[in-house]
A protein has these predicted regions:
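Active-site anion-handling motifs in enzyme catalytic cores
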Residues: 1-301
Length: 301
């Protein structure tokens, strides 16, 4: 049997963590079968809104063949727009698909009904959600539904990870919705429950999307109490290196697994990025999740 796992729809490297983890999970679970990496919708991956550009794009996903196609992530709200053509084709050809580590939150009743009707007409073999809201929204439309977790919480079980040491112990700071806070110790050892966080207004009072371009002008902490502060940058790009490397010990890579090894080698994570916290927990390190981002389901087992 051929299983093809979507692994291209990254809006940031955090998407690569749960998709690569899912690939590793299926390879370990089904060693007797052929588990391959596959493409997702080019529109989702590159957020294409221009009709001409979308027409020019070669959507290889439409030509992939497998017994089972695996789609994942926050794709349920756009499943009709981005996935329907491929799903209709694969079902017509006698193939199947599953939705694993999938999410569809913040939807209106009419949107849930429309998507639910599509899932009823073109049913997946399995729907395993990564949050309870999605499960509650669609469990009545897909008979084989499971209130699951995000596979980012499984990275240390599904992917072989190495560790390394810097010249000093370190913790991770990763922020993308606001300026990085200032960290201070209440006294004693550098532990996550012993770190105070002081938030800052954006530069010149500008919205963060603009003020981040002036972030390199700010003073940044190099360390705290003998622990280095490592900044993991999840938005992969080569255009804005003044953002990527605005602070000491900034880490960015096109290798998603290396981020996981940075997390495994750290002592803890403080972040407003849910996946940054997820992989820290997956590697048995504490994490402090700040601010109002939708919380993924997770396991403490």
């Amino acid at each position: 049997m051929k299983i093809r796992v979507e692994n291209s729809t990254w809006n940031n490297v955090g998407d690569g963590w749960y998709q690569t983890s899912l690939y590793g999970l299926l390879r370990k679970t089904f060693p007797q079968h052929q588990v391959l990496l596959g493409e997702g919708p080019v529109r989702r991956a590159f957020r294409i809104s221009n009709g001409k550009q979308l027409k020019n794009a070669l959507n290889v996903m439409d030509y992939e063949r497998a017994d089972i196609h695996v789609f994942s992530g926050p794709m349920i709200p756009s499943i009709i727009r981005d996935y329907s053509q491929a799903i209709k084709r694969l079902i017509a050809d006698g193939e199947n698909y599953v939705l694993l580590s999938a999410s569809g939150t913040g939807l209106s009743a009419s949107e849930i009904a429309e998507i639910g009707e599509f899932l009823t007409k073109y049913p997946p073999l399995l729907l395993s959600t990564r949050d309870e809201e999605t499960y509650d929204n669609f469990k009545s439309y897909v008979s084989n539904s499971y209130n699951g977790i995000c596979t980012a919480f499984l990275v240390d079980r599904t992917i072989e990870l190495d560790t390394f040491q810097l010249e000093k112990p370190f913790f991770i700071s990763s922020f993308y919705m606001e300026m990085e806070p200032t960290f201070s110790l209440r006294g004693g050892e550098v532990r996550i429950d012993n770190v105070d966080v002081e938030h800052h207004k954006t530069m010149f009072g500008l919205p963060f999307r603009y003020s981040r371009h002036q972030n390199f002008l700010r003073k940044h902490q190099y360390q705290l109490g003998g622990h280095l502060i490592v900044r993991t940058v999840q938005n992969l790009n080569t255009r804005f290196n003044h953002i990527n490397f605005a602070a000491p010990n900034s880490f960015i890579s096109f290798n998603p697994v290396r981020y996981l090894e940075v997390a495994k080698s750290s002592e803890f994570t403080i972040s407003d990025r849910v996946h940054a916290c997820a992989i820290s927990l997956a590697c048995n390190h504490p994490a402090r999740f700040l601010f109002n981002t939708h919380v993924l389901a997770y396991s403490t087992d």
